[in-house]
Swiss-Prot record:
Biological process according to GO: proteasomal protein catabolic process; ubiquitin-dependent protein catabolic process
Lineage: Archaea, Methanobacteriati, Methanobacteriota, Stenosarchaea group, Halobacteria
Keyword terms: Cytoplasm, Proteasome
PROSITE patterns: PROTEASOME_ALPHA_1 (PS00388), PROTEASOME_ALPHA_2 (PS51475)
Name of the featured protein: Proteasome subunit alpha
Matches recorded under SMART domains: Proteasome_A_N
Role: Component of the proteasome core, a large protease complex with broad specificity involved in protein degradation.
Compartments, as annotated in UniProt: Cytoplasm
Quaternary data: The 20S proteasome core is composed of 14 alpha and 14 beta subunits that assemble into four stacked heptameric rings, resulting in a barrel-shaped structure. The two inner rings, each composed of seven catalytic beta subunits, are sandwiched by two outer rings, each composed of seven alpha subunits. The catalytic chamber with the active sites is on the inside of the barrel. Has a gated structure, the ends of the cylinder being occluded by the N-termini of the alpha-subunits. Is capped at one or both ends by the proteasome regulatory ATPase, PAN.
GO function term, MF aspect, one: threonine-type endopeptidase activity
UniProt-listed Gene3D superfamilies: Glutamine Phosphoribosylpyrophosphate, subunit 1, domain 1
Protein source organism: Natronomonas pharaonis (strain ATCC 35678 / DSM 2160 / CIP 103997 / JCM 8858 / NBRC 14720 / NCIMB 2260 / Gabara)
InterPro entries named among the record's database cross-references: Ntn_hydrolases_N, Proteasome_alpha, Proteasome_alpha-type, Proteasome_asu_arc, Proteasome_asu_N, Proteasome_sua/b
Length: 255
């Protein structure tokens, strides 16, 4: 009984380590990330690809209200998984940091610099009483000094750099697919294909353009960050035979 009450005390105390060195509220925040739909980031030779699963819960919901890919700056995109409201707060923070850097130094913020600013902000909420950790993970991808960079933030406030990663639901299965098929020599087109195939691998090998968000940040593109339209996504799905059949889509609607 005493052990159980001690366990509950560590559960409630965001600033208290358990005897085995764990912060339970941070671990619970990571569980919240797993409840969000999947997001994927892939670093290619000439850019970064971001793909997200943004299926809506009801046909009555406006699709444009579901945002999982965000533009932080002309050369940086961010994908999220977990609590949408928490993601929005961090996206706004990242955008402010990018603007401040541009005004202060008259140059675009570095991808690593922005990531560490965001993770420092996240980390503060793991050691302050009266607050809770952010229940969201971000994939931050962009171009820095002509080179693609790809980072992950997690609820503990730790930044990780990746070649390819997934966050959110089915992370383990998607990550396993990426590890098996990723190559450092991928170009952006091949990176888009790999991300879509990885997401399809946990969705019965079929996807709909309405349920997918896709963006790229490329070295050669003057605009840098670019979000693809439904028509462009549909073309990529058709090219790889990943487009969900209309009969299957109708059955899903009936369910």
């Amino acid at each position: 009984m005493q052990g159980q009450s001690q366990q509950q005390a560590y559960d409630r105390g965001i600033t208290i380590f358990s005897p085995d060195g764990r912060l339970y509220q941070v671990e619970y925040a990571r569980e919240a990330v797993k409840r969000g739909t999947a997001s994927i980031g892939i670093r290619t030779e000439d850019g970064v690809v971001l793909v997200v699963d943004k299926r809506i819960r009801s046909p009555l919901m406006e699709r444009t209200s579901v945002e999982k890919i965000h533009k932080a700056d002309d050369h940086i995109g961010i994908a999220s998984a977990g609590h949408v409201a928490d993601a929005r707060q961090l996206i706004d923070f990242a955008r402010r940091q990018a603007q401040v850097n541009q005004l202060r130094y008259d140059e675009p913020i570095g991808v690593e610099t922005l990531t560490k600013a965001v993770t420092d902000h996240i980390q503060q909420y793991t050691q302050v009483g009266g607050a809770r950790p952010f229940g969201v993970a971000l994939i931050i991808g962009g171009i820095e000094d002509g080179e693609p960079r790809l980072y992950e933030t997690d609820p503990s406030g730790t930044p990780y750099e990746w070649q390819a990663l997934a966050v959110g639901a089915d992370r383990g299965d998607i990550q396993e697919y990426l590890e098996e098929h990723y190559s450092e020599s991928l170009d952006t087109e091949a990176g888009i294909g790999l991300a879509l195939e990885a997401l399809a691998s946990v969705n019965d090998d079929s996807l709909t353009p309405e349920g997918i968000g896709l963006a790229t940040v490329t070295v050669d593109d003057d605009d840098g960050f670019s979000q693809l339209s439904d028509e462009e996504i549909e073309a990529h799905l058709e090219e790889r035979d990943l487009l969900e059949a209309e009969d299957d889509a109708d059955e899903d609607d009936e369910e």
